[in-house]
Amino acid sequence: MDQSTKQTRQQSLPRHVTKTHFVFGPNIRPAMSASRSETIRLDTQDCYQGLITEDPATHLQIQEAKQIPVTGPVYVEGADIGDVLCVHIQNINLSTTGVFAIRPQTGIIGQDIRDQVVKVLPIKSNGLMLNKSISVPLQPVVGVIGVAPKHGEIET
């Protein structure tokens, strides 16, 4: 592949952001600037901030996070305070594993849970694999998305 083809291909790939933080606020330095029509990629983290690995014992070492990590911020060129922004989610690429964690007194059935259970399960094209023959279809969600307030900070 010649140099001009490489440059064209690199220019056509969306720029991406990996920086995370835990508040929306006007004083957080943007991770990137983007035009209104530009396609960008955001590499996000789960609510455990990517700290739970294939070893379920790692969950026992993690204190429940008070905040959810958000990726960015992205400064949208030409956007003014008070503008409504429309974001199109083109695709959600999933990790190769998902975490299933329950513990006593947490969640809707927490009062019925006696022991903490953590499972790190594989994600395949047909869903979350509970075992070799049973998979649960997935419905990916975006999570937290928002804009900075004019004054103050909002925790995630």
Regions found by a protein language model. Give the residues of each.
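Residue-level recognition of short, solvent-exposed, well-ordered loop/turn junctions
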Residues: 35, 77-80
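Generic recognition of long tandem-repeat/solenoid scaffolds
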Residues: 15-17, 23-25, 75, 119-121, ...
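A generic structural signal for residues embedded in beta-strands
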Residues: 42, 84-87
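Short, compositionally biased
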Residues: 53-67, 71, 99-111
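N-terminal, Lys/Arg-enriched amphipathic/low-complexity engagement segments
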Residues: 2-4, 8-62
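Intrinsically disordered, low-complexity linker/loop segments enriched in Gly/Pro
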Residues: 91-156
